[in-house]
Amino acid sequence: MNVEFPDSETLRGTNDVESEELPRFARASRERDLDSIEDVEAAAREAIADLPFDSLAPGAEVAITAGSRGIHDMPALLEGAVDALRERGFEPSVIAAMGSHGGATSEGQRETLEALGITEERLNCSIRTSMAVESVGEDSLGREVYVAEDALDADGVILANRIKPHTDFHGPVESGLCKMAVIGLGKHRGAESLHNAGLAADFSEVIRERAELIVEESPVVGGIGLIENAADRATHVEGVPADAILDREPELLDVAREELPTLPVEELDLLVVDELGKEISGTGMDTNVIGRVLFHGEDEPDSPRITRIYARSITPASHGNGLGLGLADFVHRDVVDELTLDDMYVNIVTSGEPSRARIPFTVPDDLTALLLACSTTGVAEPAELRVARIESTMKPDELLVSEPVARELDGRADVEVGELRPLAFEDGALSPLD
């Protein structure tokens, strides 16, 4: 982006705070008792066994959805499901199911899956990425409901997705199998139609209604729901027949809420996020972790209470799509330089919330962001800044925290706090978190 932002000297001159006045920092690590599935491929095979295939003849094509999120165990789940289908005599395939992600193009969606380790070579089956859709009916608002032609051409479809609280809205159905049916299989047109309808009615109910129509009018045989623990590992995998999805998904969502990763601290002046990205969250940063939603018609969370957020970088897998950047208050100039506005704006229009595409206050380096936080958080003394730094919102249990936060966490049975040290900078850049 060809914009000339102020340099560090100009910005640091807006206050008289020196780096030596910043608080000392310590590593903090929260320990959790987490259950996880050791063999996800085997769990996927068991899930396939719970789905009804009686109506399908040998050799039938059964397509499994694959989304754009960086779900650690999804490649293994897909491998197990594909192998199980082949062993049953079916012809498995995978459908790229990610709304408008990947620039809303066939090649872009294929590249998105490749970046996540989901390839034809690994799965030994075809991956279909056509953006073509057909209408299968209208919802109660009179709006078209779309399904990918690749799904309609298959003999059977399995909705595979992580079930978790959504970053935009809350209700009995959030991110999961129903959303995969509506937005994933709906491709760009379906996602745009859904998000637009969601601005006029209850988002969760719109998804539920549309998912019911899609299950009725397309060859969906069921779904495989995956629930992650706070360390982003599969803790539950379940096959859900098509006629049980609407009843079972809300129950699985309640289970997922109990596993939701959160910060170990409720109140911060500044949260430093090393990476935001589309494979981390659809909003770049998980709104349930940062305590910000900024979505039309949705209330802001009561906690955590974070005054300022600084985003340091964007992941390569995002391909410059910085949707969600508007959730931050400060952003490193390198992030702005890497933005691909074509993809970002297509995605933001589809999602229906332009405020999340706003480019925050842009800083040339990390030190400048920290010094400016002293002037923009209401803290009287720099040494009292309550700061936490995390790699991403997928890893909120591993932090670097300022001394006031370290004092608060020290002594908690579930948190280990290390030695306090001054921050180290090289040409204004923080040293690596690890």
Where are these regions (language model features)?
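Membrane helical hairpin/interfacial module
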Residues: 71, 75, 81-119
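N-terminal amphipathic/basic leader segments beginning at the initiator methionine
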Residues: 1-43
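Glycine-rich phosphate/diphosphate-binding loops that line cofactor/substrate pockets in enzymes
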Residues: 47-63, 86-89, 264-265
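Conserved, well-structured core segments that form the ligand-binding/active-site neighborhood
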Residues: 147-277
